């Protein structure tokens, strides 16, 4: 209980900082110049066992067989706030692909966090994971999505949920980008979630890899993974990025050393 109490105290101390970050992201570079993206809610997309909401952005003049990006918001955010903060809709308009934004509900989590640490919501064909899968199926049927070009990305809790979807449904995705997230299977309850976020308590790379391999019993090609994490992140410890990389290196039996190294701007 002492560990849980310390974690809760840390959460309370960081709440103000985190909310300021989210508000700044939602406002964008300037409230005078930010364009509010056009989102429409799709209410009927399946049995929705995870009780999530589905929002979609469809560019004008959408062509045949467009790509699809699934964008998962972080805690305290909404689909619309995440759309404004990330600019995904602007990119979709320029390049002609569809974006869907699953949205958490306070009845599931009072902070609007996706339930990446709840086994009933992270298993294949169960809970929130199945709801997101059903949203993808709805988008494929309604917008004629090219099923070879389905991608997923998410921030923080959304990044952790992107890890869930890539592990539970690897055959669905061409690739995914995990931003400030955590490895699949890194927590199965609230205490373990806090430990993974703040204390870097993590299973071995082999154990993490085994959890991905056993999630769907997948034998086909694995999706490509891109991992991003800010070094100043005070909500999710940046070392989680290394654990995600180690997990997927182990899953795909890759060498630890990169085949090519490119330095970008910071």
Where are these regions (language model features)?
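Short beta-strand/loop motif that positions the catalytic acidic residue
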Residues: 227-229, 233
């Amino acid at each position: 209980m002492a560990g849980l109490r310390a974690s809760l105290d840390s959460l309370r101390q960081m709440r103000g900082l985190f909310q300021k970050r989210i508000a700044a992201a939602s406002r964008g570079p300037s409230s005078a110049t930010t364009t509010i993206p056009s989102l429409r809610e799709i209410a009927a997309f399946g049995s929705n066992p995870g009780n999530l909401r589905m929002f979609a952005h469809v560019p004008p003049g959408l062509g045949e067989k467009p790509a699809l990006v699934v964008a998962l918001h972080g805690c305290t955010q909404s689909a619309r706030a995440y759309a404004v903060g990330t600019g995904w809709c602007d990119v979709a308009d320029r390049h002609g692909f569809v974006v869907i934004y699953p949205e958490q509900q306070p009845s599931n989590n009072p902070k609007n966090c996706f339930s990446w640490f709840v086994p009933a919501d992270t298993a294949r064909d169960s809970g929130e994971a199945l709801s997101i899968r059903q949203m993808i199926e709805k988008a494929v049927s309604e917008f004629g999505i090219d099923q070879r070009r389905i991608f997923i990305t998410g921030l923080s809790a959304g990044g952790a949920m992107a890890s869930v979807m890539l592990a539970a449904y690897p055959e669905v995705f061409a690739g995914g980008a995990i931003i400030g997230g955590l490895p699949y299977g890194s927590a199965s309850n609230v205490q373990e979630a806090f430990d993974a976020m703040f204390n870097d308590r993590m299973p071995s790379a082999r154990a993490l890899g085994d959890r991905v391999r056993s999630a769907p019993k997948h034998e086909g090609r694995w999706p490509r993974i891109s991992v991003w994490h800010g070094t100043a992140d005070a909500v999710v410890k940046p070392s989680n990025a290394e654990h995600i990389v180690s997990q997927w290196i182990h899953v795909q039996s890759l060498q630890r050393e990169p085949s090519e190294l490119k330095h970008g701007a910071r």
